[in-house]
Every structure is written in C-alpha cells, then in structure tokens.
Swiss-Prot record:
It is found in: Cytoplasm. Homodimer. Interacts with SufE and the SufBCD complex composed of SufB, SufC and SufD. The interaction with SufE is required to mediate the direct transfer of the sulfur atom from the S-sulfanylcysteine. PROSITE patterns: AA_TRANSFER_CLASS_5. Keywords: Cytoplasm, Lyase, Pyridoxal phosphate, Transferase. This is Cysteine desulfurase. InterPro entries: Aminotrans_V_dom (IPR000192), Aminotrans_V_PyrdxlP_BS (IPR020578), Cys_dSase_SufS (IPR010970), PyrdxlP-dep_Trfase (IPR015424), PyrdxlP-dep_Trfase_major (IPR015421), PyrdxlP-dep_Trfase_small (IPR015422). Its EC number is 2.8.1.7, 4.4.1.16. GO terms for cellular component: cytoplasm. It comes from Citrobacter koseri (strain ATCC BAA-895 / CDC 4225-83 / SGSC4696). Its cofactor is pyridoxal 5'-phosphate. Pfam families: Aminotran_5.
C-alpha cells in the first residue's frame, strides 16, 4: 500500500507556512517533531471542556480527567509492549526519566568500585546523570568506543563488563549518527554479568515498533515531543520488580500514602510515587493522541516510507561536492554532515534562507564531536511527513552554498 504522504502532510498545519518566502522544508524533527491537528485538538479540547486536577477528586470533571490520564498510561504500555501499565512513569521527557533512574535506582545499587557502561555516541542526557552518580558514589564510568563509520566497537564489550558492572546505559538510536545499536546482543551480555540495562529510546519510537519485553531491557525511556506529541511529557518504563523497590526521588503531593510530623511519611505504590505534584495532564492526553495517530498510520508503514526516503536522500547527497557524511550507511532518522571547511552554523543559516530547517551545533553530543574532531555538524532529519521534493531542495541548496562559498 502506498504511504498516504499528502494526507499526512495535510494533518500538520505548520507545513503550510513559508519561511523567507519559500515553502517550509522542516528537516529538524530529531530535535522536536511537528504536531498534527489530532494532537493539537485533543489537548485543546481537554483544556476547553474537560480540565480538572486528577486523582482524589470526587466530582465528574476530576474523575473523567483521571480516567483519561490513566487510559493513556495503558495506551503507552501497549505501544511499547510493557507487561503492565503500572510499569510506566510519566516524566517531563527522556532527560528526566534518565535522571529519575540515576537518582532513585542509582544510589541504592551503585557503590564505590562498581562501574557503569555508556557509549561514545550518547546524548548528554545519557552521560551527565551517570557522571554525577559516579562522582557521588565513587563508581567508574566506562565508555564503549566508536568506529569511524559511526558504529560501536562491539569487540571491546567483553573487556568492559565485569562482576562489578551495575548498569549499561545505551542509546537505541544515535541522535547524531542514526546508528541503531544491536540491543538484543548487548542486553543479553549485560545480563550475563548481572547488570541492568537502560535504553534511551528518544530517537527510536517514532521510526519503528519497540517491544520492551522482546528487548528484555530493564529501563526504557522516550519523549513525547519527538513522537509528534506535546512538549513536557515523556514515558519511563521500568521492569516491575525493579520499580517496586525504587524509592521516590521527589517529594510532594500525589506520591504519598500518609504524612505525619511525628511519624514521618510513607509512599504510595509505584508508579504514582514517582509522579509528585500536579501532572501535565494535557500533555499526557496529547501524547495519547500522538500514539493513536502513528499507530493508525502503522509503524511498519511509517518505517518503510522513511527508510525509502532515507536511501533516496543519501543518493542525492552523494552528488554534493565536499560533503562529509557521518554515520553508517544503514541509519534511522538523521543525516549528519559538514560542507567542506565551512562551519555548520554558516551552512545552516544559508539553508534557512532557502526555507530549509536543519539543526546545527554539537547536538548535545560533545564527546562525539571530539571523536570526529569537529566543533559542530549540520543534521537533517527524515520524518514521516517529509518528501522527496524536500530532499531535492536540501541537495540543491547545499550545491548552491558550495558554489557561493567555494
């Protein structure tokens, strides 16, 4: 079946606008994806006619809002095939989800002399929390090195793991290189050593189906705003037996069972004890609409369309003089590049003049920039609403910039 690209594009109102007098070509979805009408309308309808504080309310609006919120928890659990909706914690995004694990599970399980393994391709959100945990506990942070093609040096893994390895924290897909890591093999190896595995799924869930049970990971986290949903909402999956033993890392309303000035405080059960304060209910409802939207299109169909477009893009960009591409031939979602010796900021500014939105900078992956010995890269994203014509405009724009700047 042909992917309904025109119908999809019609659902995203921003795609009708112009930038610098030209149609917008939005190639920055890996930073944050645009939102379809279905998501915008679902959140707006909630605020117009259904808003109330959730939990403990006896009135109709509160009960209905609570039901809607918890239904999205169930919906999200099915989306990633968790065993139970109660294995999912609503968080502000991937960054908060990783920090939750580092600050709740981490101090209970990581000691001086232990080690945590990450990779050289990680986003800062999957580096800095572990650096902070290691600094507090005296644990060692070990790093899986990169190959020049943007894949990991998997042959180094046996030398990195040992009986003191407590956690492997790894990107499902690199936000810069588009590398999809071989998670089943990596997770199986980690478990052989008794280590837990956290997967940063921020760049994966919008491109193909994710099954946390099949992966056998212990933690999986993703953001709503990259999945065509609202900002300020994400999901942390934690294997049930781990979640039940984790203490809360934030205190406040909603996460308590009892509070006494003389007897102290007891916590409510998971996952709610990790959701202190008033939740982003509107964002949660918008996330549910985003999940419903991509599932209605079909993740297999989205994946096929995007992969075909990615292959086309790589073919077109191969004809751009002095263009350096970073990452493996088989990649998901992103194309990182530099043009000659020109700074990524300059190239991105020229592309913006042509109505083309790309991301420039270090992409919250400074160690990766250090590995490639560059201060920055340009990054074009391939999403389900992008077209062959937009790819052509990118290639043509880069050729034009090369002619202008030499």
């Amino acid at each position: 079946m042909t992917f309904p690209i025109e119908k999809v594009r019609a659902d995203f109102p921003v795609l009708t606008r112009e930038v610098n007098g030209l149609p917008l070509a939005y190639l920055d979805s890996a930073a944050s994806a645009q939102k379809p009408n279905q998501v915008i309308d679902a959140e707006a309808e909630f605020y117009r006619h259904g808003y109330a504080a959730v939990h403990r309310g006896i009135h109709t609006l509160s009960a209905q809002a609570t039901e809607k919120m918890e239904n999205v928890r169930k919906q999200a659990s099915l989306f990633i095939n968790a065993r139970s909706a109660e294995e999912l914690v609503f968080v502000r995004g991937t960054t908060e989800g990783i920090n939750l694990v580092a600050n709740s599970w981490g101090p209970e399980n990581v000691r001086a002399g232990d080690n945590i393994i990450i990779s050289e391709m990680e986003h800062h959100a999957n580096i800095v929390p572990w650096q902070m945990l290691c600094a507090r506990t005296g644990a060692e942070l070990r790093v899986i090195p990169l190959n020049t093609d943007g894949t990991l040096q998997l042959d180094t893994l046996p030398s990195l793991f040992d009986e003191r390895t407590r956690l492997l924290a790894i990107a499902h897909v690199s936000n810069v290189l588009g590398t999809e890591n071989p998670l089943p093999e990596m997770i199986a190896l980690a478990h052989q050593y008794g280590a837990k595995v956290l997967v940063d799924g921020a760049q994966a869930v919008m491109h193909h189906a994710v099954d946390v049970q099949a992966l056998d990971c212990d933690f999986y986290v993703f953001s709503g705003h990259k999945l065509y949903g609202p900002t300020g909402i994400g999901v942390l999956y934690v294997r049930e037996e781990l979640l039940q033993d984790m203490p809360p890392w934030e205190g406040g309303g909603s996460m308590i069972a009892t509070v006494s000035l003389t007897e102290g405080t007891t916590w409510t059960k998971a996952p709610w004890r990790f959701e202190a304060g008033t939740p982003n209910t509107g964002g949660i409802i918008g996330l549910g609409a985003a999940i419903e939207y991509v599932c209605a299109l079909g993740l297999a169909e989205i994946s096929e369309y995007e992969q075909n477009l990615m292959h086309y893009a790589l073919e077109q960009l191969a004809d751009v003089p002095e263009l350096t591409l970073y990452g493996p031939a088989n990649r998901l979602g992103v194309i990182a590049f530099n043009l000659g010796k020109h700074h990524a900021y300059d190239v991105g500014s020229f592309l913006d003049n042509y109505g083309i939105a790309v991301r420039t900078g270090h992409h919250c992956a400074m160690p990766l920039m250090t590995y490639y010995n560059v201060p920055a890269m340009c990054r074009a994203s391939i999403a389900m609403y992008n077209t062959h014509e937009e790819v052509d405009r990118l290639a043509t724009g880069l050729k034009r910039i090369h002619r202008l700047l030499g």
